[in-house]
């Protein structure tokens, strides 16, 4: 099970974390507290660290915590992309937690959002993001995620990529498969 969610607010920590422990669930940790959502990534890291430490007090391991670092809109905050990439990297390397990002948050208010979201996803994955909240029906987003998997070595032998994008030879007028470079069996037989 995955509990959605706990924040750094004391009353939420006291209510949610015992339930997470009782049921052996994982939990989404939102990087805000009583002061709200900070634009400062160091503050959001500190809130996440507080949640992870409190969860440890209940015996909840870091690997069962999925931190949402709260992606800010790049159209409003110029450095939002750089900040969240650094924050995701810190969460993964220093706190050893999983992360999730609302991919479309970064492109809020901008045109051609899918292009921005696709770029964001590949960079966030390279920074250590382990999951994302995104639309799996947008081809550009799917292609970006799959290409990042290839580049990061998460798609051995590019098998998923090839399976998804390899073109099937077209049928000829006679109903037989087209004779591309790969289909040499008939030619060899004829030459013998």
Which residues are covered by each model-predicted region?
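Catalytic beta/alpha-barrel core
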Residues: 1-10, 79-80
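Short, charged, surface-exposed secondary-structure boundary motifs
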Residues: 11-17, 37-40
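Short N-terminal helix-initiation segments at or just after the protein's N-terminus
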Residues: 8-14, 73-76
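Terminal or standalone catalytic/regulatory effector modules within metabolic enzymes
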Residues: 176-192
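Intrinsically disordered, low-complexity regions
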Residues: 9, 154, 173-181
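Catalytic alpha/beta core domains of metabolic enzymes, predominantly
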Residues: 22-172
């Amino acid at each position: 099970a995955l509990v959605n969610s706990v924040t750094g607010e004391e009353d939420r920590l006291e209510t949610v974390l015992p339930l997470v422990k009782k049921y052996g669930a994982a939990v989404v940790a939102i990087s805000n507290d009583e002061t709200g959502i900070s634009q400062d990534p160091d503050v959001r890291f500190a809130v996440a660290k507080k949640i992870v430490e409190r969860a440890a007090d209940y015996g909840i391991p870091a690997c069962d915590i999925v931190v949402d670092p709260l992606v800010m809109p790049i159209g409003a905050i110029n450095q939002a992309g750089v900040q969240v990439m650094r924050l995701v990297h810190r969460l993964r390397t220093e706190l050893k937690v999983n992360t999730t990002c609302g991919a479309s948050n970064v492109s809020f208010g901008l045109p051609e959002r899918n292009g921005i979201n696709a770029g964001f996803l590949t960079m966030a994955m390279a920074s250590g993001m382990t999951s994302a909240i995104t639309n799996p029906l947008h081809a550009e987003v799917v292609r970006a995620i799959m290409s990042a998997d290839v580049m990061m070595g998460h798609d051995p032998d590019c098998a998923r990529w090839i399976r998804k994008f390899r073109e099937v030879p077209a049928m000829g007028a006679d109903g037989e498969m087209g004779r591309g470079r790969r289909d040499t069996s008939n030619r060899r037989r004829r030459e013998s």
